[in-house]
């Protein structure tokens, strides 16, 4: 990629971009990271938004690959694209891929996607981001699969890591915890217990604290011993 500024736009598009499209799908993490770290070199020669749009078929191909390890490689590329791409292009073309990964059949991908979503929120926070994410979470919270409902809670836990920025969690995400704390599956209620207990300690919002304490009282009376342990131990 370092030769792109030297050979110019036409030759970069003819020779460099086809190689990039192939190598970005390589299974070797180091190869992909070298490409991503040198994207700025391409930006000196071609319009980066046009480049990202041209990359979408490759990104789609990776995200739909039958091999879950291949699908799991896409995070670092998405994070970089979020940093360098026009916001509108990202939300229209790449955000749907990020959202879809939250319901991937493989746990490792769902878990990694939860962490990625928090990184993306820190970079792109705004009403458009919150609306897209919450629309997906509403659907996931109603899923017949408890694993998908559990993923909602695991994602929300990522937003508890930043103890000094709880506004989005309290206003938009906490209602999901209130609902799922009554889930029929103990594992879901157990993870909700962790969130409720920690948020009760961290929040400065009186209404949120009151709701947390009400949920704590309910969860302490849960029929499952692991749920009771989670709400009393955290």
What is the predicted role of each segment?
Residues 10-24, 49-63, 88-102, 127-141, ...:
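HEAT/HEAT-like alpha-solenoid repeats
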Residues 1-6, 23-24, 38-46, 62-63, ...:
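Hydrophobic residues within the alpha-helices of tandem HEAT/HEAT-like
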Residues 212-234:
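Eukaryotic acidic, Ser/Thr-rich intrinsically disordered low-complexity regions
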Residues 25, 29-30, 64, 68-69, ...:
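Alpha-helix N-cap/helix-start positions at coil->helix boundaries
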Residues 14, 33, 53, 72, ...:
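Alpha-solenoid HEAT/ARM repeat scaffold
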Residues 1, 29-39, 68-78, 107-116, ...:
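HEAT-repeat alpha-solenoid elements in large eukaryotic scaffold proteins
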Residues 108-109, 118-170, 174:
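Eukaryotic tandem repeat interaction scaffolds
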